[in-house]
Structures are given as structure tokens and as C-alpha cells.
Amino acid sequence: MSFKDLRSFIDHLEANGELKRISYPVDPYLEMTEIADRVLRSGGPALLFENPKDNTMPVLVNLFGTPKRVAMALGKEDPLALREVGELLAFLKEPEPPTGFKDALAKLPKFKQALNMPPKSVSHAPCQQVVITGDEVDLTALPIQHCWPGDVAPLVTWGLTITKGPRQKRQNLGIYRQQLLGKNKLIMRWLDHRGGALDFKDFKELHPGERYPVVVALGSDPVTILAAVTPVPDSMSEYAFAGLLRGERTEVCKAISCDLEVPATSEIILEGYIDPNEMAEEGPYGDHTGYYNETDSFPVFTVTHITKRKDAIYHSTYTGRPPDEPAMLGVALNEVFVPILRKQYPEIIDFYLPPEGCSYRMAVISIRKQYPGHAKRVMMGAWSFLRQFMYTKFIIVVDEDVNCRDWQDVIWAITTRMDPTRDTTLIDHTPIDYLDFASPVAGLGSKMGLDATNKWPGETQREWGTPIVMDPNVKQKVDEIWQDLGIDSHPTL
């Protein structure tokens, strides 16, 4: 099942008990965050606040608050099915020509999917049913959440920022938080390595001093939103990848004020520009780390037009100490990364980003070890292969007999298969998340790799221990007689 717009997905969630409508007047200032946080931590539904205090526009939160809802957005019921998305990405990142007729037939479905990539342009779009321009533009009229007591101002969180570089054929979609600065101004907090910032940098080099067109889409269809947070190849537009996931082309329309294309069924579109000479101090804000981050200077986005659907819905979220919505997205997208990594490193059995590690700061990888030093090779590969992992501070590598998603198993491997001096790899002066205040310099810090695998000859001079394993025949017999033993519980080991 695919969803053409956010509203059809809301209907689907509600029909399946995954969305709750709230008629009570809840304040976007702090109250929505507290309610959403409690519901998310209990594994509860998405929430639609139908009557936000002092506003008539409904607010949708916790849309992707469980891995199950992320899978549902892509027409799947089980998050493990998202590995199919990873397999598609692995194919796109490193396509191999067919080796013969049978191989060509096997790859035909993926080639057919590729035909759905180009977006479809439409002339009459729901997102442009209402047009607001000039002095009528007023961002303060939107029910923008003020998430935490120490936040400096309300914050736009789920906007898809659409940019295009002068050297790029594709448009880029990225999600960057935006501080409300005035009735027609937001601060665009994009870091230097992100797609939007790179497009802006290229534009400034070729067009010094000129205004840079930018569009932000709020409340797009769920597949396009998820495409914007998925590691698509640099040469591919997120619109194209959304078409692949959906099985039909993404509908877009031309913005009113510039040539950028926007998701046609979005709830709200903010159009405008960035003046390269206008910067503002952004923050502090509570972030996904569970702390307030430092302030810094970022470009100002001036909004010249607001277009929207009739009876538009404002899509929002909050970020805080895990679990939060980004952490739940990370748990689901974890399944996307597994096939991509396996394509490059077939020895990888599984890959896990613990949500309590802020989604990406720690990774645990299980491998089928084949030679001395193998664990270190996998560490280096994970840090360098996908830019999503260049901010991962800690990587733990374990053997295939260890469940990398089970902390009891992982801690057992660390404490029994590691020597701290021999098996710890420290690398200094590496890229680190700008929000990581634990690093000595902003954006630059160290990484640690832990080799918790069994050691091979050449890695140790000791006789290595053999794990204790019960005779499988005995286990089977005990399973058969368990109900006759009069023991209530039946643990499986």
C-alpha cells in the first residue's frame, strides 16, 4: 500500500489504532512535547492535536514514533522488511551488469523499479490551494512547537528543505531545524557537510552576493519524508528514490517564486531566499543528545510566500534524550543499513545502532571473522563507507555467535574476549558531530574501536577458551519433558 499524501496515511493509521485525535486544547508551548514524550516512551500512537491553544490549525506529532509506523509508511508491516529498501539502495550504489540471461531476469524487477524514478510534474497542486504573499506572510500564525523550557524560540522541525546547486542536475531534500526569528524569517541550521549547505556554497561561488532560492515543505507524504532521511546516492534526488519506494512517480509542482519543485500534496510550503550576507545566532535548543546545544551563526531564510492546502495540518516533532522520534526512526532505518554494509563487506552478519547511543554515536557489528586483524578492517570500513557513520564515536565488533542487539551478549564478549590495550583502537582528529560538546574542539574529536572477537594466532599467544554449549540432544529432550516437570516458566536458551 502506498500513500499519496499525509492525510491518507493519517486515515490508515487511525483505522489500525495507530493514531489518536486529541480534542482538548493543548498548548504548543511545552505541553505538546510533554504529552508526545510520555506517549512515545510507552510505545503509543501518533497524536493529532485538533484544537491547539490559540490556533485553528491541527498539529500532528509522533508520526514515526515506533519502528512499526515507519514500516507502515512504506507499505510494510514489519520493520525487518525495510531491509528490502536497503537491498535496493545497495543495488543503486553499486549496480552490476547482468552476467547472463538468468541473472538479467533476476535483476529485471529492480530495473523496472528504476523506471519509476523521475518525478511527475503537475500543474494544479493541493499544496497551492491557498496562497499568502507580501505583508500577509506571518510564520507566527503557525502552531510551531516550543519544545523545551530552555529553547530560545519556537522551532520548525519536520520541514523538508529543498535546494539545488548550480552544478547539480538533481534537487536535494534535507531536514534542518529552523528557528523562528520573525514573522517572515527563520534561521536555517544546516551543517557544512549537509546537502543544502553544499548547494548553497556552490551557488555563492558562482553567484556572489545574489539571493539563493530555498523552499521548505511541511506535511509531505510519508514516503517522501522518509526518502529525505535515507542515505540515497549523491547523484540521485530524494524525489526519485521516493518514486522507487512508492512504486509510482513522486508528484511535484513548480514553486510560485522560483524554479524549485515541491511535493504537490504537501500541507504547507514556505518559499523564499537566503541572502548570503544575512546571518543570525541560532540556539540554544534541546537536542537529540538530551542536552541543550551551544549557539552558533547560521544563514537566515526569508519567507516571501506561504502556500498551503485548505484546512492544512502542521507536522511537528521534538528532539530530546532518547527515546525520541529521531531515535525510533534510527531503529527502523537500522534495517536499511544492513544490506548496504553487507554489499561492501559480505562478512558482516548484523549491524546495530543502539537508540540510547543517540542513534548513530555507537555501533555494534557482528562478523564472520576470517583472519587476524579482521575486526579492525571492519571498523575502518564502517567509519569511511557511508557518511552517516563518520560521526559514530564507538564501534564494537563481535563474532557471529554473539547477538549484537543483545547487551548481555555484547558485554559478555567485551569482558571475556578483549584485552584493553591490545584490542582498543583510538583515532584522534576525526570529524565529530558539531553538537557533541564532549569533544575537545567543535566538530573534531576522537573515535574508539573495540575488538570483542575471539583472537586468532598472531593476535594472541594464549590458548583461547572454548565457549560452553549444551549438547543439543539434551536440550531437545528437556524441551520434550518440560511440561512434566511442574515448573511454571519455560525459558528458552
Curated annotation (Swiss-Prot):
One of its GO terms (biological process) is ubiquinone biosynthetic process. Signal peptide: none annotated. Pfam families: UbiD, UbiD_C, UbiD_N. It comes from Shewanella denitrificans (strain OS217 / ATCC BAA-1090 / DSM 15013). SUPFAM superfamilies: FMN-binding split barrel, UbiD C-terminal domain-like. Prenylated FMN binds at I175, Y176, R177, R189, W190, L191, R194, G195. GO terms for cellular component: cytosol; plasma membrane. Belongs to the UbiD family. The lineage of its organism: Bacteria, Pseudomonadati, Pseudomonadota, Gammaproteobacteria, Alteromonadales. It comes from the Bacteria. It is a peripheral membrane protein. It catalyses: a 4-hydroxy-3-(all-trans-polyprenyl)benzoate + H(+) = a 2-(all-trans-polyprenyl)phenol + CO2. InterPro entries: UbiD, UbiD-like_C, UbiD-like_N, UbiD_bacteria, UbiD_Rift_dom. Homohexamer. Pathway: Cofactor biosynthesis; ubiquinone biosynthesis. The gene is ubiD. Binds 1 prenylated FMN per subunit. Its cofactor is prenylated FMN; Mn(2+). Keywords: Cell membrane, Decarboxylase, Flavoprotein, FMN, Lyase, Manganese, Membrane, Metal-binding, Ubiquinone biosynthesis. It is found in: Cell membrane. Catalyzes the decarboxylation of 3-octaprenyl-4-hydroxy benzoate to 2-octaprenylphenol, an intermediate step in ubiquinone biosynthesis. This is 3-octaprenyl-4-hydroxybenzoate carboxy-lyase. The active site is at D287 (proton donor).
